[in-house]
Curated annotation (Swiss-Prot):
The gene is pstB. InterPro entries: AAA+_ATPase, ABC_transporter-like_ATP-bd, ABC_transporter-like_CS, P-loop_NTPase, PstB-like. PROSITE patterns: ABC_TRANSPORTER_1 (PS00211), ABC_TRANSPORTER_2 (PS50893), PSTB (PS51238). Belongs to the ABC transporter superfamily. Phosphate importer (TC 3.A.1.7) family. Disulfide bonds: none annotated. ATP binds at G37, P38, S39, G40, C41, G42, K43, S44. One of its GO terms (molecular function) is ATP hydrolysis activity. The keyword Cell membrane applies. This is Phosphate import ATP-binding protein PstB. CDD domains: ABC_PstB_phosphate_transporter (cd03260). Keywords: ATP-binding, Cell membrane, Membrane, Nucleotide-binding, Phosphate transport, Translocase, Transport. SUPFAM superfamilies: P-loop containing nucleoside triphosphate hydrolases. It catalyses: phosphate(out) + ATP + H2O = ADP + 2 phosphate(in) + H(+).
Amino acid sequence: MEPKIKIRGVNFFYHRHQVLKNINMDFPDRQITAIIGPSGCGKSTLLRALNRMNDLVSGARLEGEVLLDNENVYSPNLDVVNLRKRVGMVFQQPNPFPKSIFDNVAFGPRMLGITAQSRLNEIVEKSLHQAALWDEVKDNLHKSGMALSGGQQQRLCIARVLAVEPEVILMDEPCSALDPVSTMRIEELMQELKQNYTIAIVTHNMQQAARASDWTGFLLTGDLIEYGRTGEIFSRPKDKRTEDYITGRFG
């Protein structure tokens, strides 16, 4: 099967500081790919390169290609707004807007020009169902998203991404601010979502990567040390540095 996203020969710089070094990596369609490695190794930079979130940072520069369905997302004429619709992002800290639960989810569709209330109602309900939040909030859609628990807020943010019908979901440490029960719910949700979406997740949590992902890439000081099936990476790593990291010898 053709990968949904292919990274080919990517070097990434902030001004003169090189953060990623000749990265070649695939993100298979409708699979979960984890990016692991110690702090400062370039994980989040790699993830954000997939939908050009790094463009917002002064001095950021990418060499190489990031191919989404074989189209280079760094082509000069590419519509970046449409790219970020196709490749959505869930951040480390839940970041609901200071609006109602309904308006949080409806925000993206409204920005895309959808105004019919009946259609917005459908999108909000479907997205909250997909994010496994509907049953908990269906009678309180008028209440502020800020009033939800941390785990509920993160699922609301996932619903907000789903509402614009992306093809890829990027998750940057989505459970680091959550308790174990909420973390388990997000991991279960990821397994449901991969039936329809390609997912890439950055995580510090080795157990989470082993449990939740199909593929894993290990980054160290900007180099992709090893990439492969998660079961292989965690049970039979080919590189001593990978073994040292996943067994806790450093990181």
